[in-house]
């Protein structure tokens, strides 16, 4: 029987989700399909809100009736029909986890295999002496005793307690009940008497004497029985005490250090897990860092006295116990609360911070009591810690955090594991050392490790190594060679998280699945793009359909099929303007194809700005992989920070420069990474980081509230005659307070349906039908429109509507100028893409008056942006620079890099191979320098007619 058309295709009929205009789309199965178009044109509506949503709905229909009870409010996508749909997996750009315990190794499950490798094939060493641990069979122990102690009188001891406090009365009773009469306590042989107990506040070593005998070969049978009994009592460990010289020697069926007597449990995978009590460092509980008091934050000015507020957590003096306690401490050092902190003896300060061992006397005259009284004083550090750990809520924890800093755990030095787990070595390396290697370095190490192993360990490790190598290879293939397994998931970008999930999916070897990816090229240098594309093709070649929402030129040209959504964004989009092969697309006149074939382009400026003559200079930056770099930022220019993924761009800008500026201007508590100094701050008056994070966390936030124009709109409505007659105040037109809002949905416009084991779902309020306000409020109208009608307008409509209201027009016109004319004034921030959120923030900054001395920092602002969106964005950034400001952009996109005035190129590689400053200067200079990978790609981009020639070659090769 021949295959029908739908067997070969996924067919979508009549899709009307969001702005989609009843579109029909055919996607060939088992192919790599790219969906492209302007930001807001409807790409995600088609890929995620239609295809993925319908796939999820069909999956949920397979649940039991009980499980489906929780899902009744999930609406089916507004689409007539979808045929040929496979099981769907969505791989979106979002941070993998906010859990500080989650790492690249745990997310990919590679660390699980590493733990298994160490449990089965690693060798144990003593964390005391560094010597290799040993373990023996009972027969071997008997033979060793016969050899070493022939003719000697010995005691066979079973260790019960090693260096622990307690009186051990119950333990001695148990020993006596078992029939043992002699014990060895702290090296002294003693009779186990009734009621025997020790000093409970001292550490003790306790062994029970199981047998006393003279070692003779003819009595080997008795020795064998005694050794077996001793090992049983000692949990697999025993000691032999030579009566002649009082020397002891350890023997064990477990892993043991004969010199120190420490023994390890038989290793299991959980012993190497920092999320397990058996493996985690006891100091930091497996986090790798601890919170400690920051002296500089607690004592910001040591010239002040404690009474004047010299201790920031306490503030100025008040009649409270903590001040009485400190006053009593200082009195012992002939000081008082009026003494400047810098003049206090170090010993006194130490007691103020850390407390004192003995009880503290509070004099009657200090406490205003009739008699002196005594208290335990734990010190200021403990006081802050108690507030951090208290049940008083987030406010008290935030209060405590402002006086603390995070530092590497002093016990495990960031390895997260206890000393026993860290004492195992595989091919000479601890598990932490392997986890800290770059993926590329780890892959090379494991590739060559088998030749270093003996035959026994090689046989054990072979299959585990094979699995490890396979999974590491998938990470290499998606351009993540610079990451390490120990890298916290919290620090990964959205693009990195997505590529990790992509690598995991390739490793799962699933077939006949529909994968939908959201811009997997985010954060990826041009150099690594080919590897990513090959990974997607590998996923396709397994027998899957791969649908990618993407703007990257290389990805589009490498696709089997392209769907272009447009022609513009918002209400002006939602149509399929092209679907077919890339070669066919290049010969059309869509906006996308014009940028691909060179008919349109983001023009290279004729001249580059030199700046205002002032330079911000960062000296000796050495955080993460930075190698003591010194970087110049010419003020009054557009600066591009470039380099391969993991080369140190974000470390330099987001983790060093931005926190320095934020601390200087806003007293931010965020600490910058290590650097020597910064010069030129006097030429800057503020810093603004414009990122792609949501405008708010709930549906309440929107462009109108974020930009501040909503306050002006409410003021306009309050001053209308109808509002004045009714006595309405500005709060009447707020959906956040009682009075004018709909009380059924509390002004949300939606009701939240808790989905238990799924994310919450928002459904329109049945009372106000999503308008947020009550009936009375909506009766107040301006030019025939209620305030709810205004919030429902697009920016373009609002610009026309408020053309005669200057203070409102100014703010919304800027939103139109940055290309957001299609979004609604009251559109929930949760529905805006990252690129749209960023442009709302940019518009807000543009609408403000500035002094022309502001630094704007943007991290990959082209995420989610089409070529035309990038052109609009760059026009906005150029406007900011033309006003005298400085714009610093971390970017891989060559359209941004080529229009910058000044480039800072980091590299040469990612991870440990990066962190160097390769070049700083003009784009032309980098292109001609021959340094690094960015210059090579930039040179081709700056070559006239490069795009047109590349397009002609592509079309000709596909027409043959």
Regions found by a protein language model. Give the residues of each.
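Conserved phosphate-binding elements of NTP-dependent enzyme cores
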Residues: 1-960
